[in-house]
């Protein structure tokens, strides 16, 4: 039975997402997610000059990784992910396991 490890990585630094996971297995899919951009406008002077403003932006880059693995290798892959130093990034790990039930056994139980 195959198990999929799904990882969503959010970072402010784009080169981080491109170069950090260099040791990924060949059966890994990288999917780019849409970037989000937040723009903040701040008044430079609080008194007279209303037109004098300064803008700051915050861009969040996202990447979606899917690693296909066998069920008995799941622990090894998870510890490999924990050892990866993901400084400057926020990540979410989801495990997806598909099991197959035997139809004959289920009918005998009912």
UniProtKB/Swiss-Prot annotation:
- Listed GO MF terms: structural constituent of ribosome
Q: Which portions of this protein are annotated as coiled-coil regions?
A: none
**Name of the encoding gene:** RPS10
The family this protein is said to belong to:
Belongs to the universal ribosomal protein uS10 family.
The record's section on SMART domains has: Ribosomal_S10 (SM01403)
Q: Which Pfam families match?
A: Ribosomal_S10
Highest classification ranks of the organism: Eukaryota, Viridiplantae, Streptophyta, Embryophyta, Tracheophyta
Q: Which domain of life is it from?
A: Eukaryota
**Keyword check for Mitochondrion:** yes
Q: Name one GO biological process term.
A: translation
Report the principal subcellular site. mitochondrion
What is the protein named? Answer: Small ribosomal subunit protein uS10m
Keywords, comma-separated and alphabetical: Mitochondrion, Ribonucleoprotein, Ribosomal protein
InterPro entries, sorted: Ribosomal_uS10, Ribosomal_uS10_dom, Ribosomal_uS10_dom_sf
Query: Where is it localised?
Result: Mitochondrion
Identify the species of origin. Answer: Pisum sativum
What would be one Gene Ontology cellular-component term for the protein?
A: ribonucleoprotein complex
């Amino acid at each position: 039975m195959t198990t999929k490890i799904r990882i969503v990585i959010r970072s402010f630094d784009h080169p981080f997402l491109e170069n950090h996971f260099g040791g990924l297995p060949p059966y890994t899919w990288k999917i780019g997610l849409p970037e989000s951009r937040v723009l903040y406008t701040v008044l430079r002077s609080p008194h007279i000059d209303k037109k004098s403003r300064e803008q700051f932006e915050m861009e969040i880059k996202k990447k979606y990784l899917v690693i296909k693995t066998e069920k008995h290798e799941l622990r090894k892959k998870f510890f490999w992910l924990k050892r990866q130093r993901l400084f400057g990034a926020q990540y979410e790990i989801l495990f997806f396991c598909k099991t197959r039930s035997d139809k004959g056994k289920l009918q005998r139980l009912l």
